Amino acid sequence: DFPDVRQKCLISSAKEGNILVLPREGGYVFRMYVELDKLRPDEKAAHRKFTQDDMIAAANRIIKPYTLDVKEVVWWSIYDIGHSITDKFDDVPEGEDRNPRVFTAGDACHTHSPKAGQGMNVSMQDTFNLGWKLIQVLQGRANPSLLRSYSKERLTEAKRLVETDHKWSRVMSAPTTQAERDGTEEPRIIRQFKDNLEFTGGTAVKYDTSYLFAASAHQALATGE
């Protein structure tokens, strides 16, 4: 009976955690990311043997005084939020000077929470960056050394992704403050969303100056534009 279940929203309780609600197809299906019990640093979710009923019970504690009467669970899973990043996106060892022959992209390079769809966004950016360079080299339009730029460019963005997601995860799992609940202070999740709007929208990608990218010293609009 939660009135906004068909709207994307974050439900924050004072003590029981948070739920992220994402409406899906059909007019009645929706996805819920439910925060479960806190784990010890040396503990994994698999050790606790959580069940579907545990998730539903946690959701009802968080959503109270509203209730969640589950008719059918299409799919469910338990996961730990793990932030990790690869050392490089190709097979060139540190200190070796040659063109790469093997490349990795997407989740093989960076892992994080599933919030905000960043895994898909950044993975597509990885493969687009690599794809156009491979085409140019294979068609003889560019020197194979062009492929060296892939790892450097995407590693920088992957680090930004993991750092941003770590902040997101901490904010979303933190209990709400009294000031947030009584409306005298803007919720931290709203501030985080505003601060990272361009990044989560995929429009904040910025590569360092190289032979592919000029410096931004002359990028301002001309007078009158």
Kindly label every feature range from the protein language model.
Residues V73, Y79-K167:
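Conserved mid-domain beta->alpha element of the FAD-binding
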Residues R40-K49, P65, D90-V102, R181:
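Intrinsically disordered, low-complexity coil segments
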Residues R6, M120, E180-R181:
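Eukaryotic endomembrane system proteins
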Residues K15-L20, G26, D37-P41, R98-T111, ...:
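Short, surface-exposed, charge-dense and proline/glycine-enriched linear segments
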